[in-house]
């Protein structure tokens, strides 16, 4: 999937040459919505989701025959700062749980009809502690970007993205603060269970890290403050865009992962929707900054791609109505 993408350097990553939404397909889908046996607009966001899918798949009546779910896992050097109550070994243990079908994401993908792949990214080699220096070198960042891009199935009709990594809610807060601004306290949350003192400590760590890397810009923010799973998510988003595959991002950590793409060029994320609004306090602020309205609000904060998998059911329902309902003319119903 990397053939049409330039991963020679972070500075070379550009939206130039990437496909745009098919306006004709959107118009055709909208016309079909107007002809279906219902009052105009009565299916609310389901109609908009059908048009979104039509525009990116390039057809007035898109289908989801193949849904791919990718969960990227990585470990973070900033855990040396004591920002998480769990040891980093949990990342590998959860990867094994995913692979054996025992996690929430396994059950939710089964219900939603998504093929799940878990990609572990050098778990034995955490990134650098970003309070002391950059989390990753440019070469490490580009390698993870490529891993993410190469994991995308070009025959998929939709892509779900999730993550696993002890400490990555702190990484997400740092990325959010660096790209969108504000104060660290408004970006950090409990993550996997930090208490009030732990949250305050996370805020201090994030403040220190973002100050240290204040000169980082564009995709350089990803190298300075991100992790391998965040870079892989960005790579997958870019590869999906090249293949016109719509993307459902999960919650706070996934959305923060792509914040450097938005900071580089907001158009990078035109083919992405956010599956759910996380309970993490920074997520609402981040979605507003990125111009994304989450599909669901379920008071979740698990990660793994769980909220994105739930949102896939909504997307399937939107297309079932869009493609399966009769038009007024077909049904012989007056008013069309």
Predicted regions and their residues:
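N-terminal loops that bind phosphate or other acidic moieties
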Residues: 2-336
């Amino acid at each position: 999937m990397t053939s049409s993408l330039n991963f020679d350097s972070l500075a070379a990553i550009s939206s130039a040459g990437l496909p745009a939404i098919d306006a004709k397909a959107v118009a055709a889908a909208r016309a079909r919505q107007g002809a279906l046996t219902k009052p105009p607009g009565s299916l609310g966001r389901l109609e908009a989701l059908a048009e979104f899918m039509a525009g990116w798949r390039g057809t007035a009546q898109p289908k989801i025959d193949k849904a791919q779910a990718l969960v990227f896992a990585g470990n973070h050097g900033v855990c040396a700062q004591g920002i998480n109550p769990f040891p980093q070994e949990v990342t590998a243990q959860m990867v094994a749980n995913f692979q054996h079908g025992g996690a929430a994401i396994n059950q939710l993908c089964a219900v939603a009809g998504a093929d799940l792949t878990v990609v572990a990214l050098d778990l034995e080699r955490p990134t650098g502690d970003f309070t002391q220096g950059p989390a990753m070198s440019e070469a490490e960042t580009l390698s993870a970007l490529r891993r993410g891009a190469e994991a995308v199935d070009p025959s998929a009709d939709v892509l779900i993205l999730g993550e696993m990594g002890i400490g990555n809610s702190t990484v997400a807060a740092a990325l959010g603060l660096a790209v969108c601004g504000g104060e660290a306290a408004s970006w950090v949350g409990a993550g996997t269970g930090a208490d009030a003192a732990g949250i305050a400590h996370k805020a201090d760590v994030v403040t220190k890290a973002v100050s240290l890397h204040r000169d980082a810009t564009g995709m350089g923010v990803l190298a300075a403050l991100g992790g391998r799973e965040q870079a892989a998510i960005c790579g997958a988003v870019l590869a999906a865009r090249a293949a016109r595959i719509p993307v459902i991002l999960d919650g706070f950590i996934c959305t923060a992962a792509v914040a450097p793409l938005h900071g580089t060029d907001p158009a990078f994320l035109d083919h992405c929707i956010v599956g759910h609004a996380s309970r993490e306090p920074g997520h609402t602020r981040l979605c507003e900054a990125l111009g994304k309205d989450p599909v669901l609000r379920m008071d979740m904060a698990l990660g793994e791609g769980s909220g994105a998998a739930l949102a896939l059911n909504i997307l399937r329902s939107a297309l079932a109505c869009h493609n399966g309902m009769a038009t007024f003319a077909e049904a012989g119903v007056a008013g069309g």
